[in-house]
């Protein structure tokens, strides 16, 4: 085990942390907004909305994330009308394609988490809101979503961890995040074991921080709720 190489490589690999966190943050924010919309469509009585959400979730969850990334970054470029449209300004950028892929992925998984949280809301709470004269939108904002967040947070925390690990795939499209830098170092040093141990340790540290944050958020939500 070449510890000096591991030490030197650590300071190079951590330079990929900002890009990794940028991708995770943007994908999570956009994905969460999209997930709420998809979840609302999924529980809607409108068959068109419900079916669209169902097939969106089924397609994203049923196909490999790497395949989705290849389709968006390489596949869409094969269509002339896309290359000649304003979309090409965005789709030729590997960072945009990586964020878009992860956004769609986390939206599909998070939508099911949110849907489960919505369906766990006891009918009595909704009936109480109706009896107080709350509109449907007000009940959603004041009753359904707060309870949904509390119920869905543990599972959503796991989704965040999966998102961090999934960012390693975007190195395939030449982005120099943690794994991308690690692969570059390996190509020069031919020491995959040492370098991947360092990269894996960095991922572990990031996910440890996320786990502790989620645990704290769970405590605050449960501590402030009426038991």
Give the positions of each predicted feature.
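Transmembrane alpha-helices and adjacent helix-loop boundaries
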Residues: 1-227
């Amino acid at each position: 085990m070449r510890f000096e190489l591991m030490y030197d490589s650590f300071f190079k690999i951590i330079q990929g942390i900002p890009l990794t966190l940028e991708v995770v943050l943007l994908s999570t924010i956009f994905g969460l907004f999209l997930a709420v919309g998809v979840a609302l469509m999924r529980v809607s009585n409108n068959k068109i909305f419900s079916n669209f959400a169902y097939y969106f979730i089924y397609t994203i969850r049923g196909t490999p994330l790497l395949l989705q990334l290849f389709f968006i970054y390489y596949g869409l470029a094969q269509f002339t009308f896309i290359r000649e449209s304003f979309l090409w300004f965005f789709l030729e950028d590997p960072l945009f394609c990586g964020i878009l892929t992860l956004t769609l992925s986390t939206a599909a998984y998070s939508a099911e988490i949110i849907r489960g949280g919505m369906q766990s809301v006891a009918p009595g709470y909704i009936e109480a809101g109706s009896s107080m004269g709350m509109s449907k939108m007000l009940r959603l904002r004041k009753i359904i979503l707060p309870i949904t967040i509390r119920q869905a947070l543990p599972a959503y925390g796991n989704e965040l961890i999966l998102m961090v690990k999934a960012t390693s795939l975007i190195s395939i499209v030449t982005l120099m995040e943690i794994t991308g830098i690690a692969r570059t170092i390996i190509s020069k040093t031919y020491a995959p074991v040492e370098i991947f141990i360092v990269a894996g340790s960095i991922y572990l540290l990031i996910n440890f921080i996320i786990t502790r944050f989620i645990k704290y958020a769970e405590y605050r939500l449960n501590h402030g709720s009426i038991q």
